[in-house]
Design a protein with these regions (language model features):
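Charged, low-complexity intrinsically disordered terminal segments
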Residues: 1-190
Length: 190
């Protein structure tokens, strides 16, 4: 936490990493769903779903999805089935957690159950590793993160599985979609 706090207070570093590399956008529309979206068919939830469906359906070249758990509804699978039949067929690229990187094994199991179906829909699926080979290039002092940690809850509950790699286990939690490099949907980047 101390190392991260020092980086967060380093204004030149923040500017170099985030401000200098920022892209200009021409238009931003904000839409959200209700917290209890699964319990409601409210107008705002239906409108949000329709907007997302229309954006994805408009894809001409690529749909790039980033999600920690690749679990699609029946309607979403139908949409991607229609895209597969389209000429030219847009490339569907998915970045998601691997089993080793996920924090929700049961959701990964559900995703794995449907993986063949997603591949038949033409998805190119890339799974995030918990210890990426280039983590030290992406995160300053990566090997020092987690040093001296005393969190052994997992050991107590599941038994020991000693790590042979320095650094902390990484996992993806961001949810986003980029369509044709032009439209971006950002879910919860937390």
């Amino acid at each position: 936490v101390g190392i991260l706090g020092a980086h967060a207070g380093n204004q030149p570093e923040i500017s170099r990493r985030f401000v200098d590399t920022a892209l200009r956008v021409s238009q931003v529309d904000y839409f959200s769903d209700q917290p209890q979206k699964q319990d409601s068919k409210s107008d705002s939830n239906v409108e949000l779903g329709d907007r997302i469906e229309n954006l994805i359906a408009s894809a001409q070249s690529t749909v790039l999805m980033q999600t920690p758990y690749l679990v699609l509804s029946g309607d979403a699978r139908d949409l991607f089935g229609r895209l597969k039949e389209q000429e030219p067929r847009p490339q569907i690229i998915v970045s998601t957690n691997s089993l080793a990187a996920t924090d929700a094994f049961y959701v990964y199991a559900l995703s794995h159950k449907y993986k063949k179906r997603y591949l038949k829909l033409g998805f190119s699926i890339y799974e995030f590793k918990p210890f990426p080979a280039d983590a030290d290039l992406l995160i300053n002092d990566y090997a020092l993160l987690g040093a001296g940690s005393t969190n052994n809850y997992g050991y107590q509950r599941y038994g020991q599985a000693p790590l042979t790699i320095q650094g902390v286990r990484l996992g993806m939690h961001a949810k986003s979609i980029v369509i044709d490099g032009q439209a971006t949907l950002i879910g919860s980047h937390n």
